[in-house]
Amino acid sequence: MDKSKQMNINNLSNIPEVIDPGITIPIYEEEYENNGESNSQLQQQPQKLGSYRSRAGKFSNTLSNLLPSISAKLHHSKKNSHGKNGAEFSSSNNSSQSTVASKTPRASPSRSKMMESSIDGVTMDRPGSLTPPQDMEKLVHFPDSSNNFLIPAPRGSSDSFNLPHQISRTRNNTMSSQITSISSIAPKPRTSSGIWSSNASANDPMQQHLLQQLQPTTSNNTTNSNTLNDYSTKTAYFDNMVSTSGSQMADNKMNTNNLAIPNSVWSNTRQRSQSNASSIYTDAPLYEQPARASISSHYTIPTQESPLIADEIDPQSINWVTMDPTVPSINQISNLLPTNTISISNVFPLQHQQPQLNNAINLTSTSLATLCSKYGEVISARTLRNLNMALVEFSSVESAVKALDSLQGKEVSMIGAPSKISFAKILPMHQQPPQFLLNSQGLPLGLENNNLQPQPLLQEQLFNGAVTFQQQGNVSIPVFNQQSQQSQHQNHSSGSAGFSNVLHGYNNNNSMHGNNNNSANEKEQCPFPLPPPNVNEKEDLLREIIELFEANSDEYQINSLIKKSLNHKGTSDTQNFGPLPEPLSGREFDPPKLRELRKSIDSNAFSDLEIEQLAIAMLDELPELSSDYLGNTIVQKLFEHSSDIIKDIMLRKTSKYLTSMGVHKNGTWACQKMITMAHTPRQIMQVTQGVKDYCTPLINDQFGNYVIQCVLKFGFPWNQFIFESIIANFWVIVQNRYGARAVRACLEAHDIVTPEQSIVLSAMIVTYAEYLSTNSNGALLVTWFLDTSVLPNRHSILAPRLTKRIVELCGHRLASLTILKVLNYRGDDNARKIILDSLFGNVNAHDSSPPKELTKLLCETNYGPTFVHKVLAMPLLEDDLRAHIIKQVRKVLTDSTQIQPSRRLLEEVGLASPSSTHNKTKQQQQQHHNSSISHMFATPDTSGQHMRGLSVSSVKSGGSKHTTMNTTTTNGSSASTLSPGQPLNANSNSSMGYFSYPGVFPVSGFSGNASNGYAMNNDDLSSQFDMLNFNNGTRLSLPQLSLTNHNNTTMELVNNVGSSQPHTNNNNNNNNTNYNDDNTVFETLTLHSAN
């Protein structure tokens, strides 16, 4: 650059510049030279003031919003320094006013100019300086002069020489601020050619000058005490900032209300508004709460009450690695530093080793968590399916190291199978087992005299009280007991007692009261050991029941179905849904293209030939697209418009993925469409081959059961595999919510299911009837068999199966409904006779003693006596049979002393008087009622009874309070009997209940004797409405406006009040009402005058 150009650049401060379109703003600037002059020379330079107007439309709205605020702050700084008398600034560097540099290169393509808003120590009112017009101050509102916007908080000598964050104008919480809230992110440093660039680097001479002046002697009294802590410029984490600049905040208590991202100290950015847009720091609202002013700067992780436990999870469902060489290669890692997670090999399910706990869920992982809890806090414990591997995650690495050293080589899960402990890492995701032989005391052999047999570490957790069980339906959920985990390694001698507590809930004799913590609303536990025997053990019984049906069926098909069911090779794992399609690295049909294709197909823009061409083009991505949100709709259209040949090609590509597709919320629609559109034998065969091996998990799935019902429509023999799978895994399916309903749907499809298939399934229901009747889902099939099935003699065939466990079933609340359904069936008296004879004995046998089953049932305190009472209340019982049952029940109740019979049963058999028991109960309730509401009325009398206050309810039911007419006896005095017409002294101390007898009025507060009335408390106002009383004792008869007097007539009452006949009148509102209470009516009476 030549000399002339340099001269022009040096004189640029005298030239008006473009500031903001359409706004006149005073700009205070000072020109600096870049030749290294001293501070004294800088302070002696005059300050120029310029005010210019320009209009241009090339600046953005953001720039327009910034400039007025900056100008206002600069102008306010000038006014603050001038004062009212226009005094000059002090030129000393120790001034109480701080300086803030704002280097602002101007918008010029060929030059850049350094501007400063204000410099301390430079006078403003020198000759030749420009003075802004007075009306400029009216453009913006300036705050109080005590608010020094550009003066930072005081700094100490030990503070670092880093300029604080500039706090610029807060953005309004408007719609535009919410839409563009991301604009608060600091921009990258611009070059000097930018209009509004960031501040200069610290190496700039101007910044060096400013850093020397940032040592004020006084502090700002208006410093904001916002509790939001400053974020370091080197890291986005808050805790790191505390160590670097903690002294600065502690000594000076600076206002660092800045949410700018790191490395934005020199940026001229705005504050983020409080909007719904994504925040830079997710913890910003946490620090903005005023109530958290004294919160610690360190983040704390809340402690879990119990660890995360899960048994037999899919190893592919989590992302994990370990140094154990026995795991699959994809989960192996050669070198891994100590982590907070360990892997334990040779971990076998405890449910297989403990038959009495086979219905417990998450048992192994719970026991594993209790075992490892003594080494530290356990976050999660998981066992992996088919790997005999467990992953235990601790809260710290030290706990994991301690557990690894202690458990290495120990027999954790099974004796003779030492476990290998290795470090692991859980990465985030974008033969018949041996049974215990019980002795006479009910304890396992070897536990006598506290001589414990060798047990693996996991099984010890079951016996030392660290794990308790809660029954949820037919499964037991182990509960992590944190109180016992502290002393579990000290009390090894308590194993026998703990084992007896575990077995207590599974003993048949104590099954009903072994779990006292369960509420009445929870599902009842099955009284039989679960799971039931396999169908292989019930084959003979199954064939016997089929013969009892005596139905015309093909015996060959029945035998073939049973034989194939016994040799069924399909999976019984309800979580195995077959292979998944391989994920595609790059998809040709992305969502935008799929959306366009669907629009074109829906608008009939493609012909069938073009759709078939599209199907061939999408063939490689077809399995993946079938489970896509948009792709499954395209696949459905392809199967609707393609020919059989194209459908064969597509089914060949997708058939092996039908199971995994059918259980997906999107893929199930494409899967059902494929099955529905399959018509040719080749297509049907491909569909059945795809779902045959995974029928059981499909039936038990909420989406997959609809897939099975679609396959059912293929008919015999294509749907034969469905019945084979149901018979082979009968209990696994029928106890499931979806499985039981899917089986019922198969039985109700009369036009599709063959008689042989229906007969075999019906025989399976009878075979497992005692188990099904105790399960809420299985009971649906028993109900179908009794109510819907058309097989002859089905009740008589089912009754013998129920009588073998009659006591347990009748004492079970749910199972007893099945028994009552058989007893109330009118079309089969033989079934009713079988059940009643098993409970109460044969009615024709003379002097027969009650069966043992009846004694056991009446001793069952849960539901047994209630069931017997319901049997006696059946309307179908003949008189002689009812008398026989009552006789047997009376004999058992009188002979046994251990039975606690219910009141209703005692009344039913005549051992208790219904009236006496009823009256006694009523009196108890009445006494309790009187004592509970006595404080609500006036001062009670000696009897403790009170009158009913006059209200709508008391007028309509005045005699509803069941109190006697006898006075209450106190201090041994006898009670006098009162008749309705007997005169009563008003001064009598006796009290009487409020009854609406004809001719008797409650009188209170009168002098003298009151005839034809009875005493009442002063809180009753009924006398105010019945009569008028004069001071001379005369009582004037008034027509009573009651609900029963329409004509306002009076009736003469002589001596016998009871001779009045009840009658019905109409009131003035024409309501036909007769209010009778205890054979009395409201009557209109005439009271004779005392004169």
From Swiss-Prot:
Pfam families: PUF, RRM_1. SMART domains: Pumilio, RRM. One of its GO terms (molecular function) is mRNA 3'-UTR AU-rich region binding. Residues 31-51, 75-131, 482-534, 568-591, 911-981 are annotated as: Disordered. Residues 482-494, 507-520, 915-935, 951-979 have a biased composition (Low complexity). Pumilio repeats lie at residues 617-652, 653-689, 690-724, 725-760, 801-837. Residues 557-913 form the PUM-HD domain. One of its GO terms (biological process) is protein-containing complex localization. One of its GO terms (cellular component) is cytoplasmic side of mitochondrial outer membrane. Residues 99-111, 568-577 have a biased composition (Polar residues). It comes from the Eukaryota. The modification Phosphothreonine is found at T131. CDD domains: RRM_ScJSN1_like. Residues 340-426 form the RRM domain. The modification Phosphoserine is found at S129, S160, S168, S913. Keywords: Phosphoprotein, Repeat, RNA-binding. Present with 784 molecules/cell in log phase SD medium. This is Protein JSN1.
